[in-house]
């Protein structure tokens, strides 16, 4: 409202929208304190109203259209500072540390991932494991993508960084690289930081699972003398051979997290029962909970897999369970048909 620029708050489609998590919800009174009511009044004043008639969206010729398009520049230039101001207010209230770009990892990291979206939680688990074993790795999380503030990105990258892998959850065929990768390369080039090697990768298209093994593979690639400039993770690309080799990964979930996996048949009630179970645990205990349900578009009659986690610590594991503490198979024929139960 204060910035007077339209916003799109986006997240990783199915992976995030269909996940059940315990979250903290703000009270409306707290939200009201965050809102600049003068800015709200100014916003409403510009709404279509018969008491204040105005004409918009009719026709504009080429003699003035370009000038009008450039006239909005000051609003976009000021927007990152407005966002940062409100992030500061949130941090003050909740004790968080939201920035336009947040760094996570070793303070002297030499290998850094830059990404946004669900892979950031997976990367945090991997970074915790690797730094505990003496590795100098880290990650920059992007919270405000547009307008892109290059100076804030550069200040978030450790001075010791030598190599960067940028991960995009999109594919732009025919381009030199995906959008975030191109933004990072441009920001570094404009700042004269040509000594940092940058590679770009794709992950998670169509909610493809991105397990810790994929993130380990990215850091392994950054350790090589000859790196793939463009790569994919989470799949085996036997056509263009862009995928990175992924090795079995150690368990990196928070200590004490219980992981349960349920195999079922679409329409047999397995998914519904598990949704109720995880909600009961979340509503009536102090446990952190997470549930994600894997099924195809056929739904009824197809294979379903329910992934349930709960524990005493926040759960960052935005990927399928591959080392379950408990497994249930509600369709006996799955066992003899080669499913990886």
What are these regions (language model features)?
Residues 12, 18-25, 124-126, 151-152, ...:
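Short acidic, glycine/serine/threonine-rich loops at helix termini
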Residues 11-18, 117, 171, 203-207, ...:
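Glycine-rich beta-alpha junction loops
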């Amino acid at each position: 409202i204060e910035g007077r620029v339209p916003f799109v708050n986006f997240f990783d489609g199915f992976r995030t929208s269909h996940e059940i998590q315990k979250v903290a919800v703000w009270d409306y009174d707290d939200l009201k304190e965050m809102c600049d009511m003068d800015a709200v009044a100014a916003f409403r004043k510009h709404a279509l109203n018969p008491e204040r008639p105005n004409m918009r969206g009719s026709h504009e010729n080429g003699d003035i259209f370009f000038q009008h398009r450039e006239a909005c520049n000051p609003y976009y230039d000021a927007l990152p500072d407005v966002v940062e101001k409100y992030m500061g207010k949130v941090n003050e209230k909740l004790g968080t540390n939201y920035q336009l770009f947040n760094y996570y990892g070793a303070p002297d990291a030499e290998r850094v991932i830059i990404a946004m979206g669900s892979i950031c939680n997976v990367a945090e688990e991997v970074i915790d494991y690797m730094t505990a074993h003496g590795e100098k790795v880290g990650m920059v999380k992007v919270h405000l993508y547009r307008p892109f503030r290059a100076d804030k990105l550069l200040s978030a990258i450790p001075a010791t960084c030598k190599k960067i892998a940028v991960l995009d959850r999109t594919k732009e065929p025919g381009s030199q690289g995906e959008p975030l990768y191109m933004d990072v390369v441009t920001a570094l080039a404009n700042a004269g930081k040509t000594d940092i090697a940058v590679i770009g990768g794709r992950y998670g298209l169509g909610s493809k699972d991105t397990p810790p093994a994929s993130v380990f593979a990215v850091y392994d690639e950054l350790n090589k003398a000859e790196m793939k400039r463009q790569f994919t993770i989470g799949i085996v690309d036997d056509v263009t051979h862009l995928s990175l080799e992924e090795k079995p990964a150690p368990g990196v979930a928070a200590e004490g997290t219980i992981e349960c996996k349920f195999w079922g048949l679409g329409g047999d009630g397995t998914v519904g029962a598990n949704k109720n179970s995880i909600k009961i645990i979340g509503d009536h205990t102090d446990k952190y909970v997470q549930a994600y349900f894997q099924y195809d578009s056929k739904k009824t009659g197809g294979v379903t897999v329910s992934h349930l986690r709960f524990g005493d610590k926040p759960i960052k594991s935005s990927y399928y369970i591959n080392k379950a503490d408990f497994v249930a198979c509600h369709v006996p024929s799955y066992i003899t048909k080669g499913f990886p139960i």
